[in-house]
Every structure is written in structure tokens, then in C-alpha cells.
């Protein structure tokens, strides 16, 4: 088995990207497993640029990987495989992922960039891989969507938690740039939302979208904001103006909510928790959405929803954000830090309903924002390291 593509590249470059062109023109059945693994890490298994046959070959290779046992994880090993007699190990150590493989009688290794690492994780088989104490990823899992409800009810259910995927460049996910896009991400999401799209909860209390829209406007988050700007916290009078414009001043029924939001909107850690949850790099890429749609169509599912042939009814995407205050072990935990910490759970739910069936995909990211975290790219980067994320991914298609 020739592994020169990877080995030579290891000597000349820290990234595998520069060798992709040397493999993409080769007939697929002539590629070595190293070349296939290279394409997976470079593009991801769900890349729309590859054929279904290529994706099948990639999936077959990735299915060879199994979770490593705890006693095998001295160097951070979390997955291993034996392919064509060659041992491959995937390791994560101090936030850096490396691929180890046996080349003759020598062990070769290559470090992955963060993008390559994410492509690798999203391509692992439906088994649970543990990556340290705070990072667990569950790879794609297939399920069955069974219902006897009529098509209109199925569509309504999907719409209630979804909004249209935004097709143009003004709102499309930007490059993976280490939180530099977060202000634009929340602006795009809120501006494009409607009553059935983004849902935001604090301690299970839904926060009205108009209230959030007024908040980000007062914070100066707009289409022209500098991506590296640190947000300036609002004064009591500024927050009070936002609250009074959204709740009737004389109505005592909203008094509890008004006091709650007045407190939250002056807490930098809450603003950090809220804005970071919209960072699109935490969630889903357009290629993943395209893959789900292609998968549903390629499976040739029977027309269960009784739609017109070739009718594409829904291509939707919803965003659900849950922020919960962390209950301190003692009263000093709040006073010493000047605020409280927040747990953030941010889910995105793209769904596709076509004449051929229903596809639902969920990606959920959970992390902790510590008390006093400042709403800035630097503050978010320090508060939310990549290894703290927990991502779940599922595809549901109709039972054939």
C-alpha cells in the first residue's frame, strides 16, 4: 500500500490541503485508502462536490473506525481502525488532532487543522467517540420517521420549528473565522426570523424576538458592525427604554418578566451567552443540508405524503436557543465574580419535506459561559474552547 501522498506532505506542509489536487483527478477506484481519507478530511463526507458512489466509498472506509478503550487513550487516542492491514489511530491531545498510521516499519503522523478536524468528526460512523472529559460527539445516526397524520399536519409540525433556509450571500454562513463573524451572525438570524423560526428561552421562559431585536439594535449590532468590536454594556436607562417599549408599563402581569430582563440585559455574561449562540460555525454547513436532501432523493422513498411529482414543498431551518442560569453552590459564587454563569444549548433543525418524504437533521451545541465573560471575540474565544462543545447529529427519513 502506497502512502507517499501523506508521507511526503507531512515533510513539506503542516496541512493536507495542498495535495488535494494531486488526488482529485485520479479515478476513484485507483485511490489508496490514504487518498480517500485525505479527501474525507479535506472536504467532509457530506461534500456536495462528490458523487454518491464516492460518498459510499468514503462511508465504507469511515465505518472501519471504532471508539478506543479508556486504557488505550494514554496519548489521547479516541478512534482506531485497521484498513488493508494498516493500523490507523486518531488522537486528540491539547486540542490538536493527529492521525497516526504505520508506514512500513515506521509510524507516521499528521496534524490536522481545525477545519480538517471538524470534517473528520462529522464523518465518523454512528458510534460514540469520547474526546476527553468535556467533549463527546455522536456521529450521524439514521432513524425512521413514521406517522399516519395527513400531509398538511406533517408540514405544519415542521414549519412550527423551522424557518426558510436563506439562499443569498447577504445571509449565508460566513467563513469559519474564530468568532469574528458572531455579530453578523446574530444580526442575520434575527433579521431573517419570523414567528416560527428562532426561539430563545431563558430558564424555560421564552424571550420575545422583538425584544431581542431591540436589544441588539441598542447594542449597535448591525450590518456595518466591526467584527472585532467589543460590545459596550447598556445603561439602566437604555435597558429600561427597551423593556417599556415591549411590555405595557401599567400591566402588573409582566412585572416579573420586566425585572428579569432588566437584570439580564445589563449582565455582560448573559449578552455573551446570547450572542455566542448564533455563531454559525457551531452548527451546520450548507453542504450538510444539501447532503440530507440528496440522501432522501437518492433513497427513492415512496410518495407517502401524496404530493405532486418533483414538488419540493419545504426546505426549512429553525434555531432554538436555551440559556439557563447556573445555580451557584453558595452565595459567594455570584458576588465574588460580579455576575452569574450561564449554560447555553443552541440547536439548529433543518428539515426537508418533498414528494419523496421527510428529512430532519439536528445539531445541538452545549457549552458554559463563565460569569464576567465580556461580549467580544476575545472573550468568547476564551470562554468557549472547541473541546467544550458537544454536538449531536441525526438524520430521520420515512420508513420505506
Curated annotation (Swiss-Prot):
Active site: 34
Pfam hit, one: EspG
UniProt xrefs under InterPro entries: Cys_protease_VirA/EspG (IPR009669), Cys_protease_VirA/EspG_N (IPR043098)
Gene Ontology MF annotations: cysteine-type endopeptidase activity
UniProt keyword terms in alphabetical order: Hydrolase, Plasmid, Protease, Secreted, Thiol protease, Virulence
Gene Ontology terms: biological process: proteolysis
Coiled coil start-end: none
Enzyme class: hydrolase
Enzyme Commission number(s) of this protein: 3.4.22.-
GO cellular component, one term: extracellular region
Protein function: Alpha-tubulin-specific protease that is required for entry into epithelial cells and for subsequent intra- and intercellular spreading. Contributes to bacterial entry into epithelial cells by inducing microtubule (MT) destabilization and the formation of membrane ruffles. The membrane ruffling evoked by VirA results from the activation of host rac1, which is associated with the destruction of MT networks. Creates a tunnel inside the host cell cytoplasm by breaking down the microtubule infrastructure.
Complex formation: Monomer. Interacts specifically with alpha tubulin, a major component of microtubule.
Protein family: Belongs to the protease EspG/VirA family.
Protein name according to UniProt: Cysteine protease-like VirA
